[in-house]
């Protein structure tokens, strides 16, 4: 095949894909990247951060990106990487917790407390590292029960039983957008010398830029490195940061945690490697750097406000039609109660609407990303009404 034939053939496959701007993708935490990232991708498409000594400029960009993200997360000296996404970031944090625990006690099964609303990546980490995961009950606000956590840790300490090595708090859970009380979790972690990881894959590029008028009294919005107990955080630029996929992020409080991640790689220009994936494109790093420079703090504040306004519009219009949200929106994520979400979701898909469902509650899940407009919301609610009538 010649070049033209190859491109024409590829176009056929691309036409099979949904496009964000059409508004039918309502269940994804990703969105159409900022247009500047096309030009940046062309510039950095051959870079490989798996061998940073060969791509020193791109590595310098990564360091700057981590520092810039650290600034709005109140961490002046962050250590971390731009990696494939939230899954790799969460597994990396669990790897750090596991290695720290093993360094203290050789024959010890690492125990981590996390909510049942935690992302599926933690289940992958459990399988990989044979972790012992403890899931406390949820409050009516779909956050972890703090009393249960305190009692569980105290009971373990009193019995000299297997200690707790890690806690995971969620800042914008995948299904509902709820935010665990990271401030209180930080206190618990500090008092008991426990590693606290915050999964802010979604919320990391929303919460710091959220106007106070959108904040609910039932949730604590303090979640970042200003809390001394927080040791690591997942935050994904390819979600609300408008970077192209793949551009996830893992940040640690400082570089002292690197030794728990490093493996030797003597045949590369840097003899140690800490990320799970070895070969890493520099496109995500450079694109994140570019979008963050373009947007700045004000740009992300405006983006968060626009998405929250549309989120509240969705809830208001849904209520008029008799659809009830599971909780008031904490972030730009809405869960609408439904007796049979699997069936409803399947019917909507046949009509061209792609939403998702929750596992912790019977509900339809809608993410109001930047590509979602009010006209899309109106059309979707019309389709949902039609489905429920039939």
Swiss-Prot record:
The modification N6-(pyridoxal phosphate)lysine is found at residue 239. One of its GO terms (biological process) is methanofuran biosynthetic process. Its EC number is 4.1.1.11, 4.1.1.25. The keyword DNA-binding does not apply. Coiled coil: none annotated. Pathway: Cofactor biosynthesis; methanofuran biosynthesis; Cofactor biosynthesis; coenzyme A biosynthesis. It catalyses: L-tyrosine + H(+) = tyramine + CO2; L-aspartate + H(+) = beta-alanine + CO2. Transmembrane segments: none annotated. NCBIfam families: tyr_de_CO2_Arch (TIGR03812). This is Probable L-tyrosine/L-aspartate decarboxylase. The gene is mfnA.
């Amino acid at each position: 095949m010649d070049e033209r034939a190859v491109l024409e053939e590829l176009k056929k496959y691309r036409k099979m894909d949904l496009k964000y701007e059409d508004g039918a993708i309502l269940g994804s935490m990703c969105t159409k990247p900022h247009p500047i990232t096309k030009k940046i991708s062309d510039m950095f498409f051959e870079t490989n951060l798996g061998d940073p000594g060969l791509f020193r400029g791109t590595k310098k960009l990564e360091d700057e990106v981590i520092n810039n993200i650290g600034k709005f997360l109140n961490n002046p000296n962050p250590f971390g990487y731009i990696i494939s996404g939230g899954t790799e970031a969460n597994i990396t944090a669990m790897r750090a917790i596991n290695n720290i625990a093993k360094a203290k006690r050789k024959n010890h099964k690492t125990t981590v407390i996390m909510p049942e609303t935690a992302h599926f990546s933690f289940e992958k980490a459990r399988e990989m590292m044979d972790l012992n995961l403890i899931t406390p009950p949820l409050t009516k606000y779909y956050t972890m029960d703090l009393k249960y956590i305190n009692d569980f840790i105290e009971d373990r300490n009193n019995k000299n039983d297997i200690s707790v090595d890690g806690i995971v708090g969620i800042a914008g859970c995948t299904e509902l957008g709820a935010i665990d009380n990271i401030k209180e979790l930080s206190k618990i972690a500090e008092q008991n010398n426990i590693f606290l990881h915050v999964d802010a894959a979604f919320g990391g590029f929303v919460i710091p830029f959220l106007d106070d008028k959108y904040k609910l009294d039932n949730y604590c919005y303090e979640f970042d490195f200003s809390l001394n107990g927080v040791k690591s955080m997942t935050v994904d630029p390819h979600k609300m940061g408008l970077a192209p996929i793949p551009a996830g992020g893992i940040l640690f409080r400082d570089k002292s945690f690197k030794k728990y991640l490093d493996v030797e790689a003597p045949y590369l220009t840097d003899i140690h490697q800490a990320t799970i994936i070895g070969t890493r494109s520099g496109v995500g790093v450079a694109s994140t750097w570019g979008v963050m420079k373009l947007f700045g703090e004000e740009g992300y504040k405006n983006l968060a406000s626009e998405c929250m306004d549309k989120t509240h519009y969705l809830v208001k219009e849904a209520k008029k039609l008799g659809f009830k949200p599971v909780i008031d929106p904490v972030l730009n994520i809405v869960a609408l109660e439904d007796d049979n979400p699997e069936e409803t979701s399947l019917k909507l898909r046949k009509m061209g609407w792609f939403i998702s469902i929750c596992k912790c509650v019977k509900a339809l899940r809608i993410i109001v990303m930047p590509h979602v407009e009010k006209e899309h919301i109106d059309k979707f609610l019309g389709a949902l009404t039609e489905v429920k009538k039939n």
